[in-house]
C-alpha cells in the first residue's frame, strides 16, 4: 500500500513531500541502553554529518570518472545543499584547475566548485577564503558554472529553489602570473601539523 507523505516544510531533501511512499505499520519498538545518535537542527543550514557521509564518495566518483589521480580530497561543506564543493589537489600545470572544475561539472551536479592547492585545509574556512581573496583575479580565475534545470517544487510545497548555476573558482597559487611576485605561504605543511596533533595526548593537550 502506498500513500503520499508530506510535505512537511523546511529544507529541501529532508522533510519534503515523498509521493507514493510505502505505508509502514509499526508493531513494536525496541530501545538500546546506550544508543548512538546524532542531532538534526533544521534551519538555514542543517546540522548533521553530511561531510562525513558524502565527501569520500564524491572523491572516488570524481577521480574515477575524470582520471585526475592528483585530486586529494573533495569536501562537501555543511552549507552546500547539493551545490557546493571544495576540491584539494596537487596542481601540476596552469590549465589543471580549470580542467578539474570542468570535470566536476561534467560528472557531478554541483553549482559552486572551488579548487585549492594540496596544502589547504578544506575544513578551515579561514584557509579557504584567504586563498580566494589572495589568489583569485575574477576575470582570469572565475567562470560561470554549468547551468542545470530549475528544480520545480511539488504542488502545495513552499521551499527554497536554488539558482540554476553557480561559479567555478581557481583558488590555487602555483602556476598563476601576477603583476608582483607573491611571497611564499607562511604555513607549516599538513604532514607536520598532523605529526604535532598526534602528540597532543602525550603533552596532555587532548
Predicted features and spans:
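Charged, compositionally biased interaction regions
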Residues: 1-206
Amino acid at each position: 500500500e502506498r500513500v503520499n507523505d508530506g510535505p512537511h516544510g523546511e529544507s529541501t531533501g529532508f522533510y519534503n513531500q515523498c509521493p507514493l511512499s510505502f505505508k509502514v505499520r509499526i508493531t513494536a519498538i525496541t530501545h538500546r541502553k546506550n544508543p548512538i545518535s546524532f542531532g538534526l537542527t533544521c534551519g538555514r543550514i542543517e546540522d548533521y554529518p553530511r561531510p562525513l557521509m558524502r565527501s569520500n564518495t564524491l572523491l572516488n566518483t570524481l577521480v574515477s570518472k575524470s582520471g585526475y589521480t592528483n585530486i586529494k580530497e573533495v569536501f562537501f561543506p555543511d552549507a552546500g545543499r547539493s551545490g557546493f564543493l571544495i576540491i584539494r589537489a596537487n596542481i601540476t600545470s596552469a590549465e589543471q584547475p580549470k580542467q578539474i572544475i570542468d570535470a566536476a561539472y561534467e560528472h557531478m551536479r554541483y553549482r559552486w566548485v572551488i579548487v585549492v592547492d594540496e596544502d589547504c585545509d578544506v575544513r578551515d574556512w579561514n584557509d579557504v577564503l584567504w586563498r580566494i581573496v589572495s589568489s583569485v583575479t575574477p576575470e582570469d580565475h572565475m567562470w560561470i558554472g554549468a547551468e542545470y534545470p530549475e528544480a520545480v517544487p511539488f504542488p502545495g510545497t513552499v521551499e527554497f529553489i536554488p539558482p540554476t548555476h553557480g561559479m567555478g573558482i581557481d583558488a590555487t597559487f602555483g602556476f598563476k602570473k601576477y603583476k608582483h611576485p607573491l611571497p611564499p605561504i607562511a604555513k607549516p605543511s599538513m604532514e607536520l601539523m598532523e605529526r604535532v596533533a598526534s602528540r597532543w595526548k602525550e603533552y596532555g593537550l587532548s
